[in-house]
């Protein structure tokens, strides 16, 4: 991720604002250690991306997303016809990643 950002910035030396980065987390699915589809994993991925972005002087902003989970066509990549990438559930209840973001953004 960090290397790809640097490569793109070398080719296009402009300020960067990165939006819509996340991974899926099924609401209420928790696992320690974290595992794919868990809220812990989503929070770690988003926090890790933000740490990388904060270390790049050419990155002037970021906004993980989407805000909330949303319906999609059913497939093996979309359990129960949902995209679970949101920081909040479809009903707008915060997932662990939303709480993690609040902590990061208050620093």
Predicted segments, located by residue:
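Substrate-binding clefts and catalytic carboxylate motifs of secreted carbohydrate-active enzymes
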Residues: 1-107
């Amino acid at each position: 991720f960090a290397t790809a950002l640097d490569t793109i910035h070398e080719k296009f030396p402009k300020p960067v604002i990165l939006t819509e980065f996340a991974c899926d987390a099924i609401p209420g699915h928790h696992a320690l250690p974290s595992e794919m589809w868990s809220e812990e994993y989503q929070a770690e991925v988003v926090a890790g991306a933000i740490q990388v972005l904060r270390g790049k002087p050419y990155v002037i902003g970021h906004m993980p997303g989407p805000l909330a989970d949303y319906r999609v066509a059913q497939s093996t990549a979309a359990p129960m016809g949902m995209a679970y990438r949101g920081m909040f559930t479809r009903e707008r209840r915060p997932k662990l990643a939303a709480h993690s973001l609040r902590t990061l953004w208050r620093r």
